[in-house]
């Protein structure tokens, strides 16, 4: 069970640390905390000026960084919902994916890439970018062939099914979606 007092204490501590250190990274961290308050706390917070300023800061930061590192990739992967679906979001997604390919030798590469792909597949499918979505699903399929990456197989099956469903093969799509749901339930989760 979540302890709201503990969570509030951590949030306050992180904000205090961020305010004490006036560095670009501390300002970015404060902006992320501000955005996450509305995602995990109060959705009405999205209308506040603090949320809008934080959203703008994160978007501007990601646009202004010329060379992304793991840190920028993770920020985009976690905060991609801040960008409206469309060319800008797709461009940032492709930038993150291409940048990650440069880190193939890094031991966390498969996890970072899976996280990025899963977080962006739904918007790609909803916006009709089926070719790019198919490429992302194929990459996930390749990544989940490794036994250490099995946790990513359920979202891969789900999005593969959703893609099949919307591109003209509803029977196969529903079959994959139901399979993903069954696996998820077997692991003790609700879908």
Task: Walk through the language-model features, giving the residues of each.
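Amphipathic alpha-helical segments of tetratricopeptide repeats
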Residues: 14-19, 56-63, 97-105, 137-146, ...
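Short, charged amphipathic alpha-helical surface segments
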Residues: 1-44
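Alpha-solenoid helical repeat architecture
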Residues: 22-32, 68-74, 106-116, 146-156, ...
């Amino acid at each position: 069970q979540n302890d709201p007092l503990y969570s509030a204490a951590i949030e306050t501590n992180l904000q205090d640390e961020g305010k004490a250190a006036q560095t670009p990274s501390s300002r970015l961290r404060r902006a992320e905390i501000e955005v996450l308050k509305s995602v995990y706390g109060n959705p009405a917070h999205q209308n506040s000026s603090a949320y809008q300023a934080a959203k703008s800061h994160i978007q501007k930061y990601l646009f202004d960084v010329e060379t992304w590192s793991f840190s920028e990739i993770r920020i985009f992967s976690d905060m991609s919902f801040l960008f409206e679906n469309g060319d800008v979001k797709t461009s940032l997604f492709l930038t993150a994916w291409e940048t990650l390919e440069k880190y193939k030798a890094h031991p966390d590469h498969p996890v970072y890439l899976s996280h990025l792909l899963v977080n962006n597949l739904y918007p790609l499918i909803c916006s009709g970018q089926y070719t790019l979505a198919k490429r992302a699903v194929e990459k996930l399929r390749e990544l989940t062939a490794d036994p250490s990456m099995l946790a990513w197989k359920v979202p891969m099956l789900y999005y593969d099914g959703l893609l099949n469903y919307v591109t003209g093969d509803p029977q196969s799509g529903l079959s994959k979606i139901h399979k993903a749901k069954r696996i998820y339930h077997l692991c003790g989760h609700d879908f």
